[in-house]
């Protein structure tokens, strides 16, 4: 379920808003330049690779690239692999890479093909936890301080859009705020 929970930056228990209403979510985020759209989902095999995923969403991907000036697109997939003894360590490392507050010099645009993840947007004196699910397209403006949680058992596939080949370069703030907020798992229980 797509939802937003807005909390005071210094008190995670001071919840100003929690809603799964898509119109209310979009209206809440729009003043900050954050866009949330929805694409229809396509039938894909569980192990669909990058080429198959991009082919299934070719028209939408081309439109986002044209409108936003994105020249590089890739697909990232992280799904549980209980038969792989390395899986827990790989999942923890992947999760840890994005859990600290940072910003980028370009927009962060993601389409969730499957699964879910949470963008935490530090805007003014509040944190907006935006849980995205399959079908959600989110665009976070360049310079927005944020972090991302994929959960303790990551399960998602996302199409990522970049202006430059090295587009995901985080400028980390050094703030410990991410460690004071509820995790994705806590938000969705």
Curated annotation (Swiss-Prot):
Q: What is this protein called?
A: Acireductone dioxygenase 1
The terms under GO molecular function for this entry are: acireductone dioxygenase (Ni2+-requiring) activity; acireductone dioxygenase [iron(II)-requiring] activity; iron ion binding; nickel cation binding
What cofactors does this protein use? Answer: Fe(2+); Ni(2+)
Note the superkingdom of the native organism.
Bacteria
Q: What is its EC number?
A: 1.13.11.54, 1.13.11.53
Q: How does it assemble?
A: Monomer.
InterPro entries in the record: ARD, ARD_bac, RmlC-like_jellyroll, RmlC_Cupin_sf
Q: What is the lineage of its organism?
A: Bacteria, Bacillati, Actinomycetota, Actinomycetes, Mycobacteriales
Short name of one Pfam family for this protein? ARD
Per the annotation, how and in what number is the cofactor bound?
Binds 1 Fe(2+) cation per monomer. Binds 1 nickel ion per monomer.
Record-linked Gene3D superfamilies? Jelly Rolls
Site, as annotated: May play a role in metal incorporation in vivo = 101
Cited function: Catalyzes 2 different reactions between oxygen and the acireductone 1,2-dihydroxy-3-keto-5-methylthiopentene (DHK-MTPene) depending upon the metal bound in the active site. Fe-containing acireductone dioxygenase (Fe-ARD) produces formate and 2-keto-4-methylthiobutyrate (KMTB), the alpha-ketoacid precursor of methionine in the methionine recycle pathway. Ni-containing acireductone dioxygenase (Ni-ARD) produces methylthiopropionate, carbon monoxide and formate, and does not lie on the methionine recycle pathway.
Q: Where does Ni(2+) bind?
A: 102, 104, 108, 146
Protein family according to the UniProt entry: Belongs to the acireductone dioxygenase (ARD) family.
Which organism was this protein described from? Nocardia farcinica (strain IFM 10152)
Tell me yes or no: is Iron among this UniProt entry's keywords. Answer: yes
Give one GO biological process term: L-methionine salvage from methylthioadenosine
> Pathway, per Swiss-Prot/TrEMBL?
Amino-acid biosynthesis; L-methionine biosynthesis via salvage pathway; L-methionine from S-methyl-5-thio-alpha-D-ribose 1-phosphate: step 5/6
Record-linked HAMAP family: Salvage_MtnD (MF_01682)
Q: Kind of enzyme, top EC level? A: oxidoreductase
Keywords attached to this entry: Amino-acid biosynthesis, Dioxygenase, Iron, Metal-binding, Methionine biosynthesis, Nickel, Oxidoreductase
Instruction: Point out the gene that encodes the protein.
Output: mtnD1
Positions contributing to Fe(2+) binding = 102, 104, 108, 146
List the residues marked with site Important to generate the dianion.
110
């Amino acid at each position: 379920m797509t939802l937003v929970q807005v909390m005071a930056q210094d008190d995670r228990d001071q919840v100003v808003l929690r809603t799964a209403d898509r119109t209310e979510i979009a209206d809440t985020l729009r003043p900050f330049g954050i866009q949330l759209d929805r694409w229809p989902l396509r039938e894909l095999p569980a192990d669909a690779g990058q080429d198959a995923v991009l082919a299934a969403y070719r028209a939408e991907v081309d439109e986002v690239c044209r409108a936003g000036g994105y020249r590089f697109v890739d697909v990232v997939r992280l799904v549980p692999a209980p038969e792989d003894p390395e899986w827990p360590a790989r999942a923890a490392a992947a999760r840890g890479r994005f859990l600290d507050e940072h910003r980028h010099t370009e927009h962060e645009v993601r389409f969730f093909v499957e699964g879910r993840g949470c963008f935490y947007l530090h805007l003014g004196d509040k944190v907006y936890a935006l849980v995205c699910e399959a079908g959600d397209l989110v665009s976070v403006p360049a310079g927005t301080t944020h972090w991302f949680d994929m959960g303790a058992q990551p399960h998602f596939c996302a199409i990522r859009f970049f202006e430059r080949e090295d587009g995901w370069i985080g400028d980390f703030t050094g703030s410990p705020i991410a460690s004071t907020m509820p995790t994705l798992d806590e938000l969705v229980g």
